[in-house]
Amino acid sequence: MLEDLRLYQLISPSLPVGSFTYSQGLEWAIEKGWVTNVTELKHWLSNQLMDSLATLELPVLAKLTQLLQQEEWQQAQEWCDFIIANRETKELRLEERQRGLAFSMLLPKLGIELNQTTLPMVKQTQVAAFALAANHWNLTPTKLAAAYAWGWLENAVIVGIKLVPLGQSAGQQLLLEMADVIPQAVEKSQHWPEHLIGSFTPAQVLASSRHESQYTRLFRS
């Protein structure tokens, strides 16, 4: 049970890592009329979940967890570099690094020590932070992947509630419906071939690149 509680803490929206400050392009998509209601938001998020998280973040998270446990530092660093290379806009790269930097300051306070090898990895990507925490707290790969996906989803729905806008009840209903997709994404990630690891979300990439110069915005760029 304690391991599960640690996992809940790791994905909590109250965690001071700035997850709620970025929209990952959704703010621009909403302004331009791509996403105008809860149905379109569900479609937008489902595509990201199945074509990015399930095929990029979650497979890399599993690999990093194993490699860091085995102290295969060079291979682990290569996968951290790979994550950054797949952040296709300046905004997405900045978000990844800023969350990683926040985790680099937070993990030691949670009892997870970082050394001269692991510290640069965590500063580079939050995925490395989750992998280190998983090893420290003996979290199972399936639970870790599901929790990572849930944390991403909850933050994305918060963005939708603020910007579409949606009511709080509609947001909770969307979370309930989208939760059914998370097990599918986790299973897909566990069987995804290594040579195909990557993301294919061109609409999100375009929206993120345009959000960088959006005149009025609530979320960081």
UniProtKB/Swiss-Prot annotation:
Keywords, comma-separated and alphabetical: Chaperone, Cytoplasm, Nickel insertion
Keyword field contains Hydrolase: no
Gene3D superfamilies, A to Z: Urease accessory protein UreF
GO cellular component: cytoplasm
Disulfide linkage: none
Entry keyword Kinase: no
Primary localisation category: cytoplasm
GO-annotated molecular function: nickel cation binding
Oligomeric and partner information: UreD, UreF and UreG form a complex that acts as a GTP-hydrolysis-dependent molecular chaperone, activating the urease apoprotein by helping to assemble the nickel containing metallocenter of UreC. The UreE protein probably delivers the nickel.
Job description of the protein: Required for maturation of urease via the functional incorporation of the urease nickel metallocenter.
Protein name stated in the entry: Urease accessory protein UreF
